[in-house]
């Protein structure tokens, strides 16, 4: 039985502290859709998605209403498209292969709109060691696919602790990001494109969600939110030491995660689909008070980004994991604190104040998930510089055996200090300054940075 004060506490979390479930994501295998005929492949994919997800949104909304817990997004993640498209494009020339990939992307978008999900992830390639012909075709098609779709998200895994960093793929992704920015309005395509090291197979969050090869046919994964709830707890403890602070964060993370698992299991039961994982990531929104930066400031930092920010974030991340892991046995996805710039009003203010730089942001990614996220940079930034930013972030992931990622937006025509506004969950991004010195010769070397000693675990 729940005590009355627990019920009141939960209501307060939802009404006053922005507690919500960020996403309920249906993972779908498309491996049974494979065909040598492109039209048949597209038809199979469309039918599989629309039949499997036809009740997803309606079910999630009904359960959200039943428990009074807002579910912000309903999403789908599919098998990486590069793994299912090979047979249909193997006899085509390069230009036709790219066109075929885009057509599949358009089918994904059409299916996403049909079942009314907010986003569909899985326009993806796994090239952490090398790339196949279909991997390369899919990567080359990303800017054109983004130009023609609205809800499809793309991710490319270019590094892992076991294989090292595929620098040829890193170089290419810098160019792809630049081209995507050019081809989409306000570079919005780049907000739906992420480059990974050690990408998880069960991530419910966009833009990096895909349905991994080790997964079953269908699964429900959920992602929690709740920075406002954590901040409220810390603000009640202005003089507490760090041990007490960590303990209180653990307790509230336990409660947040318990809500996430409850909703996830209810949705999966209603849909007749297996329940997968709860992703413990604290995901901010542009709403006032729903901010990771504000949590760090509540700990005693004048502004997020000042000295001590990395330590504060490490404490937060660790305490959230410990509390969340107590609440559910099935933890997965990214499971940490997100520090996206545009999606976090406190981060935006820190950049505006000059407290948070790109370099400090990179340092903070060493102790949380997921990486350089929703960072807008000047549109004239060279592709080689973007590739170098990716390489740095991949190195952090590979050496520390953790997931890291880059979602960076070179906005055409914008300079440092200006803004790009996307509205909604993506928020408003200040254009951040990048290092003016060139990395081009370094990136041109190509090849693969070998796996670190940490890879030799057998």
From Swiss-Prot:
<comment type="similarity">
    <text>Belongs to the UPF0210 family.</text>
</comment>
<protein>
    <recommendedName>
        <fullName>UPF0210 protein MJ1665</fullName>
    </recommendedName>
</protein>
<dbReference type="InterPro" id="IPR007841">
    <property type="entry name" value="UPF0210"/>
</dbReference>
<dbReference type="Pfam" id="PF05167">
    <property type="entry name" value="DUF711"/>
</dbReference>
């Amino acid at each position: 039985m729940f005590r009355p004060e627990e019920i009141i506490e939960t209501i307060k979390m939802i009404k006053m502290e922005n507690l919500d479930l960020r996403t309920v994501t249906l993972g779908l295998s498309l491996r049974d859709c494979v065909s040598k005929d492109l039209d048949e492949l597209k038809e199979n994919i469309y039918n599989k998605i629309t039949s499997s997800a036809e009740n997803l949104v309606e079910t999630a909304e009904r359960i959200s209403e039943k428990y009074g817990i807002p579910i912000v997004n309903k999403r789908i993640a599919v098998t990486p498209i590069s793994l299912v498209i090979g047979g249909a494009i193997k006899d085509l020339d390069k230009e036709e292969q790219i066109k075929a990939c885009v057509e599949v992307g358009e089918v994904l978008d059409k299916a996403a709109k049909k079942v009314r999900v907010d986003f569909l992830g899985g326009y993806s390639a796994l090239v952490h060691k090398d790339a196949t012909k279909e991997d390369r075709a899919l990567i080359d098609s990303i800017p054109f696919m983004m130009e023609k779709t609205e809800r499809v998200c793309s991710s490319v895994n270019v590094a892992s602790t076991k294989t090292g960093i595929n620098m040829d793929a890193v170089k290419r992704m810098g160019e792809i990001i630049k081209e995507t920015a050019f081809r989409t309005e306000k570079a919005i395509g780049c907000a739906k494109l992420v480059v990974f090291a050690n990408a998880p197979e069960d991530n419910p969050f966009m833009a990096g969600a895909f349905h991994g090869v080790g997964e079953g046919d269908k699964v429900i994964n959920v992602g929690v939110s709740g920075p406002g709830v954590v901040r409220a707890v810390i603000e009640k403890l202005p003089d507490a030491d760090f041990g007490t602070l960590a303990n209180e964060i653990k307790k509230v993370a336990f409660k947040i995660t318990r809500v996430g698992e409850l909703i996830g299991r209810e949705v999966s039961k209603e849909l007749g689909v297996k329940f997968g994982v709860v992703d413990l990531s604290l995901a901010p929104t542009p709403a006032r008070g729903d901010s990771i930066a504000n949590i760090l400031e509540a700990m005693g930092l004048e502004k997020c980004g000042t000295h001590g920010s990395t330590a504060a974030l490490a404490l937060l991340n660790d305490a959230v994991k410990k509390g969340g892991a107590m609440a559910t046995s099935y933890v997965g996805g990214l499971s940490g604190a997100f520090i996206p710039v545009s999606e976090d009003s406190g981060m935006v203010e820190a950049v505006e104040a000059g407290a948070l730089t790109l370099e400090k942001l990179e340092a903070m990614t060493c102790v949380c998930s997921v990486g350089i996220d929703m960072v807008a940079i000047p549109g004239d930034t060279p592709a080689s510089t973007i590739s170098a930013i990716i390489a740095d972030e991949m190195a952090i992931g590979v050496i520390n055996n953790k997931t890291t990622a880059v979602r960076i937006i070179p906005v055409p025509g914008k300079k440092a200090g200006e803004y790009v506004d996307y509205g909604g969950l993506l928020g408003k991004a200040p254009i951040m300054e990048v290092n003016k010195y060139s990395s081009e010769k370094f990136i041109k070397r190509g090849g693969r940075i070998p796996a670190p000693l940490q890879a030799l675990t057998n």
